């Protein structure tokens, strides 16, 4: 990626998360890592950030690699903060809503759209200088194999909004372009 900015180009090899400040038009690399397919980034109420990498189902504490690394350098291998149950994942969120019970506050929510069709839920806890998360019962699960939750966010009303891609075929052209189930 190369993005031209008023302050000069921002370059990364492979994947990255960027930070944009609208008032100053600053656009900078926030996280540069060899993600397979980054599909989730969320901050908790304390400003800690967590990153979900879709393809492998990896989830990371962002603080460890949220910092300046000059192109083409990358951060080394990072420890995941939860043991993945399924892959791939798509979209993450932290529960922070009066609409949810007290025991769910601060839980990490993680969509899954292939092996498990629903929203997984993990109880966050401190682990040394980092974090760990333990699975608790899923927030929701669909028996419809076409349910593909790909993002989720809390709205100003406190409700959780979930985007459903709803598609019988997913992948990078493993299926014929003329497959009758495509985009149904």
Regions found by a protein language model. Name each.
Residues 1-184:
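Beta-propeller domains with acidic blade repeats across secreted/periplasmic ectodomains
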